[in-house]
């Protein structure tokens, strides 16, 4: 019985020595406030998103509706590259192309490794190279001032 236990422990140790990811992405200082209804942020209005300077490689702020916002670090936990929200190119009725973002199914993606995360909680999608969640910054909507605060 002791030989079986030793063999199982050895097998478990060998299996766990595979590719390991370190989910500790370096995070820079992030503290800012904005008025999300300001026309300075046109892509944020109406369940959209905006990129901001801060953190390690930037912050993506996403409007989830009803004054609810999420903010994520734009550094890929797997390879350290900057993540983006992929755009779609749509042919308009007037025959011109325009860039649109699928707000109802907004996914964050690393263009280098192909990992993808869902916008609601930063969880990696099935099939992604990374199994790490995106770093989440805190957000606070102040109803009295109409300002949104984002920070570490």
What are these regions (language model features)?
Residues 13-16:
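C-terminal motif of bacterial Sec signal peptides marking the signal peptidase cleavage site
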Residues 121-139:
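Low-complexity, intrinsically disordered Gly/Pro/Thr-rich segments
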Residues 2-9:
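Sec-dependent signal peptide recognition
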Residues 18-103, 118, 135-152:
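N-terminal pre-ligand scaffold of iron-sulfur
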Residues 105-113:
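Cysteine-rich micro-motifs
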């Amino acid at each position: 019985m002791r030989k079986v236990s030793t063999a199982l422990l050895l097998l478990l140790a060998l299996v766990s020595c595979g590719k390991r990811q370190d989910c500790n992405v370096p995070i820079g200082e992030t503290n800012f406030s904005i008025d999300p209804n300001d026309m300075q942020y046109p892509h944020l209005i109406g369940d959209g998103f905006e990129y901001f300077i801060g953190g390690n490689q930037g912050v993506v702020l996403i409007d989830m509706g009803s004054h609810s916002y999420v903010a994520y670090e734009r550094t890929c936990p797997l390879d350290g590259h900057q993540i983006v929200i992929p755009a779609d190119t749509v042919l308009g009725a007037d025959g011109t192309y325009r860039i649109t973002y699928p707000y109802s199914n907004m996914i964050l993606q690393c263009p280098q490794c192909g990992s993808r995360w869902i916008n609601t909680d930063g969880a990696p999608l099935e099939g992604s190279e990374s199994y790490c969640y995106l770093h989440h910054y805190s957000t606070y909507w102040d109803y009295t001032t109409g300002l949104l605060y984002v920070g570490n």
